[in-house]
């Protein structure tokens, strides 16, 4: 488990979900891509034009963020201001951008 308090974890993980939603909203307004974002508590589901999905959800007991896409599932822990994959050390937004680009069929970039 991370060195975060529960309150800090919730604040940081909520910030991630909100940043993703804001990016999707901006893309819709700018007619970049039509991704449907549906948030229920700590789960955010992104539905792409081809009906494929990416799911980002919080895991409060573990202080992790999980990302699931067609390519697989990934677990992230907060360290040094970033969400880092527990297996390969990659950064969350880079992985989300890669997976969204693959499923969206065009370059898409998420930032925190």
How should each PLM-predicted stretch be described?
Residues 1-112:
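N-terminal intrinsically disordered, cationic/polar leader segments
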């Amino acid at each position: 488990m991370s060195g975060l308090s529960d309150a800090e974890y919730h604040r940081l993980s909520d910030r991630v979900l909100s940043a993703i939603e804001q990016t999707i909203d901006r893309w819709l307004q700018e007619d970049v891509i039509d991704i449907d974002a549906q948030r229920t508590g700590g789960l955010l589901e992104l539905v792409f034009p081809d009906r494929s999905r990416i799911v980002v959800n919080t895991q409060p007991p573990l202080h992790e963020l999980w990302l699931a896409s067609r390519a697989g599932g990934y677990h992230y822990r907060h360290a040094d201001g970033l969400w880092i994959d527990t297996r390969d050390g990659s950064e969350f937004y880079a992985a989300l951008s890669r997976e969204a680009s693959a499923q969206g069929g065009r370059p898409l970039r998420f930032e925190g």
